[in-house]
Amino acid sequence: HGRATAISTGIKVANPDLNVWQACGDGDALAIGGNHFIHAIRRNVDINIILFNNQIYGLTKGQYSPTSKFGAISKTSPYGTVEHPFNPGSLVLGAKGTFFARSLDSDLKLSSEVMLSAAKHDGCSVMEMLTNCVIFNDGAHKLIADREVRADRTIVLRHGEKMIFGKDRNKGIMLDGMGLRVVTIGENGITEDDILVHDAHSENVGIHMMLADMKYPDFPVALGVIRD
């Protein structure tokens, strides 16, 4: 528990020819294994990490995790958590990660896309998989993942494409001073020319940090390859 990154790092260092994939959860990767996790990213070890984030400890039966929402009720927080959650994307990019992507467990097409991109990446790749836990945290990502609302509450980023989203493809992301802003195309003189183009390969991590930090309801949640 928590040692997956240490083991996968050792395997890769011992046999660099191996294509190493690691599965871990929000609990073991960001709590008991957090030290191994951030230093593998910092060292840019050529491994592929899939972080399944269901915002709860599932294996150990329902304790709150580092990604549990503020106020979440669990076996170890019967009156609600008093801690604000980690954003895995911010953690990865803050540790100088060279690849970060995010997907939904229910979106097989997008998940396949980001895994293929991760496999091609030279260095440590981290994919955050937003998953449900039917037993201990059912509906963990319901507010953004349900098919009826997904198009308006998430944005799929692809390198070289404009940051446009919405069921009617009429919403976009613009720079607003030093931050980001959601706009409606066709209103207040806004056109597609005003919308940001995603550059996953930019050396400047600032925009990637802002994209990884976007949270509903103020912003759509960013999916796809954010940094590569």
PLM features: what roles do these ranges have?
Residues 4, 12, 27-29, 33-35, ...:
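Gly/Ser/Thr-rich beta-alpha loop segments that engage phosphate groups in nucleotides
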Residues 32-47, 52, 56-201:
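Glycine-rich ThDP/TPP pyrophosphate-binding loop and its adjacent helix/strand module
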